From Swiss-Prot:
It catalyses: adenosine(1518)/adenosine(1519) in 16S rRNA + 4 S-adenosyl-L-methionine = N(6)-dimethyladenosine(1518)/N(6)-dimethyladenosine(1519) in 16S rRNA + 4 S-adenosyl-L-homocysteine + 4 H(+). It is found in: Cytoplasm. NCBIfam families: ksgA. The keyword Ligase does not apply. This is Ribosomal RNA small subunit methyltransferase A. GO terms for molecular function: 16S rRNA (adenine(1518)-N(6)/adenine(1519)-N(6))-dimethyltransferase activity; RNA binding. Belongs to the class I-like SAM-binding methyltransferase superfamily. rRNA adenine N(6)-methyltransferase family. RsmA subfamily. It comes from the Bacteria. S-adenosyl-L-methionine binds at residues 11, 13, 37, 57, 85, 104. GO terms for cellular component: cytosol. Specifically dimethylates two adjacent adenosines (A1518 and A1519) in the loop of a conserved hairpin near the 3'-end of 16S rRNA in the 30S particle. May play a critical role in biogenesis of 30S subunits. Its EC number is 2.1.1.182.
Length: 269
């Protein structure tokens, strides 16, 4: 019997119904599946019934087990198994062609990995298991108290959907929190919206400023980095009141403020 390791945040999904619902939520047109965290291979097994799969597993002790379990699939090249930290591999790309990500993510790296998937031009979308609170943040809409920078980033490329909750007793060992499965099917790419990757990175930094102190108004947050008179002029132009908080805006308004600040900056050069 394999004992889950705390250092890897391992909680193995054993609920057959939840596994089936994850498979059903993957778009029919998905061709290449990348899985992060093959674990004991329960989800991997279900994925291989429909798709070609490339799985990343960080736990060396599980690699030999997975090689044995999926020996036939490895031999006929329907399955590719990679040992290592997916976050480190992401620097050079998880896959050399378009793919759809499926993952039961360790809670401690879930947000970071989803943001990587959002930024990855080759990633067409994802179905991911995360802590319920994280799921609510990614899927939050303008006006929700959970709405934040990561909600905006997800909204840029498509609509992040909260699919279903998964209780703690669906896992072995059972985590101390409730989990949830979310899905993002990308409908836009970075160059559909931004001039280049530099502008996109600048926009992400801009969002960090906007949400730096959620209880303060967006005007107060932005005025720590930008001239207040210029901000007031932009807000007036966009017909926005200065007492708005960041969670009350949407991507379109954030982008309009960002673009106007950029135009002002270029004029002053």
């Amino acid at each position: 019997m394999y004992i889950a390791k705390k250092k890897f945040g391992q909680n193995f999904l054993k609920d057959k119904n939840a596994l089936n619902k994850i498979i059903e939520s993957i778009p029919e047109n998905a061709e290449n599946i990348v899985e992060i965290g093959a674990g004991l291979g329960d989800l991997t097994y279900e994925l291989l019934r429909k798709f070609k799969v490339k799985s990343y597993e960080i736990d060396k002790d599980l690699i030999e087990f997975l090689k044995s379990k999926f020996a036939c699939e490895l031999e006929n090249r329907k399955f590719e198994l990679v040992f290592g930290d997916a976050l480190k591999f992401w620097k050079n790309g998880l896959c050399n062609k378009n793919y759809f990500l499926v993952a039961n993510l360790p809670y401690y790296v879930a947000t970071n990995m989803i943001l990587k998937a959002i930024d990855d031009e080759l990633c067409d979308g994802f179905v991911a298991m995360v802590q319920k609170e994280v799921a609510e943040k990614f899927c939050a809409e303008s006006g929700d108290s959970e709405f934040g920078g990561i909600s905006v980033l997800a909204d840029i490329f498509g609509k992040c959907e909260f699919l279903f909750s998964v209780p703690a007793d669906s896992f072995e060992p059972a985590p101390k929190v409730v989990s949830a499965v979310i899905r993002l099917k990308k409908t836009r790419k970075i160059d559909d919206i931004f001039e280049n990757s530099v502008q996109y990175e600048n926009f992400k930094n801009f969002l960090k400023i906007c949400f730096s102190s959620p209880r303060k108004t967006i005007m107060k947050n932005l005025s720590t980095k930008f001239d207040k008179e210029i901000l007031q002029s932009i807000f007036e132009k966009l017909d926005l009141t200065t007492n708005l908080r960041a969670h009350e805006l949407n991507f379109t308004l954030f982008f309009k403020i960002f673009k106007n600040l950029r135009i002002r900056d270029e004029r002053n050069k």
